Amino acid sequence: MNSERAQVANPPTQTPVPQQQEIPLAMVHGQPVLQIPQDLYIPPDALEVILDAFEGPLDLLLYLIRRQNLNILDIPVAEITRQYVDYINVMQELRFELAAEYLVMAAILAEIKSRMLLPRPPNIENEEGEDPRAELVRRLQEYERFKQAAEDLDALPRLDRDNSAAHAFVADQTTVRIPPPVNMKELLLALQDVLKRAELFSGHAIRREALSVRQRMGDILAHLEDGKFHPFTTLFTAEEGKLGVLVTFLAILELAKEQLLDIVQEASLGPIYIKSLAIHHTNGPLQLSSDFDNSPSTHAPP
């Protein structure tokens, strides 16, 4: 009986059940974060970095409005002011040049908030007074236009960022086009054309002075003394008849044999052009000779 009373007086000690420790969501500066932040969480000492990402207080204010998809013409001043001040309060190490602008905007927001909370006088209660947010909205709209224009300009392709200029060295290549040579068949065809035109001139049979091939060679070189190409047909005078045409043709052949003429043709059956090469001879007067004449003649190059 006594033993039962002793057991009732001193009940056995129960071992406490261990509770599972709550797992933190994150660790910030060694401190666990157990609850999900209700708003954008900014860790300590981070405002300096965050504010550097904004171009000024208007940029920060516009960011808060855009983040919540708010109407810029109907800003909830109380909520925006609270969020804006939260950004300012987390700064521990002040940077006065940077903080001054943001503190001024915080004061402006606080003033607008207080003006909207104050009751209006009865005499203007039913009248449409000026919205305390009007000036701030105007500044935000103007800043938003400039910011959008800057973003559009930044999106344009930029040299050395989006593309690079290509540089290539192109050597100065002057192509010398050498016309193809003319064969005897082409010359005879051209001669036939000249003879046909010479037949158109008819006259009385009179005795003429003998035509000299050597003299005609000199006449041809004189005609071509400018060193340019001339049409083959311009060397002939149809009024001289067939005899004059043949003498001129023989003179051309003699000059070509002496390498004093350059005869070219662009295409088969195309026009023939002739250029004098006598300008390259600087060794005094040329001694022109022909198998069709008895004695040589002298021609001074231009």
Curated annotation (Swiss-Prot):
Entry keyword set: Cell cycle, Cell division, Chromosome partition, Cytoplasm
BP term (GO), one: cell division
Family: Belongs to the ScpA family.
Subunit-level organization: Component of a cohesin-like complex composed of ScpA, ScpB and the Smc homodimer, in which ScpA and ScpB bind to the head domain of Smc. The presence of the three proteins is required for the association of the complex with DNA.
Role, per record: Participates in chromosomal partition during cell division. May act via the formation of a condensin-like complex containing Smc and ScpB that pull DNA away from mid-cell into both cell halves.
PANTHER family xref list: SEGREGATION AND CONDENSATION PROTEIN A
The protein's name: Segregation and condensation protein A
Gene name as annotated: scpA
